Amino acid sequence: MRATQSLPFKSFWSRSLDELSRLTNIVVKSENIRGATGPREIHNFQTPESVADCKLLSDADVGGSSTAHLDWVPPPNAIPTVTAGDGSDRKPYTPIPGSYARFHGTISLELPTDRREISRTGYAGFRTLDRPPTIFGRGLWDIDPYAYLAMRVKTDARSYFVNVRTESVVPLDLHQHRLFVKKPGQWETVLIKWNDFVRTNHGKVIEPQTGMLRQKVLSIGFSTTDRKAGPYELCVERLWATNDFDEAGVVETDVAGAQLKNKHGEKVKVTWGALEQE
């Protein structure tokens, strides 16, 4: 499955005003001294265009047969309505609480017959698109004031990774962590410590490890990890940065089972090829 076609983000000046408002709020509340006073939204799926702000990845990009889809699912009887424009070409919709994105498809281990250099398939994923620039420069997430990445998710019984891309000297580096849930098939709020992510490149853990560049986060995404043929489904309502440990209905407490390991720990499971290269 190729990348989702994206509509434009907010207009340049609208984005710049939003960023100016955020920076002003930090100064007024002295958050640069006292620390963040509340959570910071990273991405939510309350509008139809929210899924267009994401990119699909799978082994189909290298000739494999796995499929990947990202659908917007509103609550029953909800009708999207268009609000006033912000100067961009996209249609801005009124947010609908309770909406979510459904990432689903089928994993296939079949190798492409016309590309002998491809020796491994069986993966799929998606990530948020890189944020467009503002008058203040490149669009980046500064999550340094926060301890946790929080997410509202519902998974099947399969295994997934959470993947974080940052501005880096090595563009193909990813910071990864297992998405560990207690109740597959039910909605849960999961918290992962930013410091628990492990840096990888082309599916291998990088040694020595270096800390995530938390002031310059480019995108956040999810990927399958188990390489088992068959259907998969992961639903995501929203992602945000927080310092509030109590926000989680299920917190990532089983660190031994959830984290990647370095060369001094147990075996490491990672994603494959193309997901690192996009």
Swiss-Prot record:
Which InterPro entries does the UniProt record give? Galactose-bd-like_sf, NADH-UbQ_OxRdtase-assoc_prot30, NDUFAF1
Keyword Mitochondrion among UniProt keywords: yes
FT transit peptide: 1-8
**Compartment(s) where it occurs, according to its Swiss-Prot or TrEMBL record:** Mitochondrion
Q: Which GO terms describe its cellular component?
A: mitochondrion; oxidoreductase complex
Ordered alphabetically, the record's keywords are:
Chaperone, Mitochondrion, Transit peptide
Question: What's the superkingdom here?
Answer: Eukaryota
Q: Which GO terms describe its molecular function?
A: unfolded protein binding
One Gene Ontology term from the biological process aspect of the record: mitochondrial electron transport, NADH to ubiquinone
Family as reported in the entry's similarity comment? Belongs to the CIA30 family.
Summarizing the function annotation, the protein's role is: Chaperone protein involved in the assembly of the mitochondrial NADH:ubiquinone oxidoreductase complex (complex I).
User: Would you tell me the protein name for this molecule?
Assistant: Complex I intermediate-associated protein 30, mitochondrial
What is the species listed in this Swiss-Prot or TrEMBL entry?
Answer: Neurospora crassa (strain ATCC 24698 / 74-OR23-1A / CBS 708.71 / DSM 1257 / FGSC 987)
Q: Which gene encodes it?
A: cia30
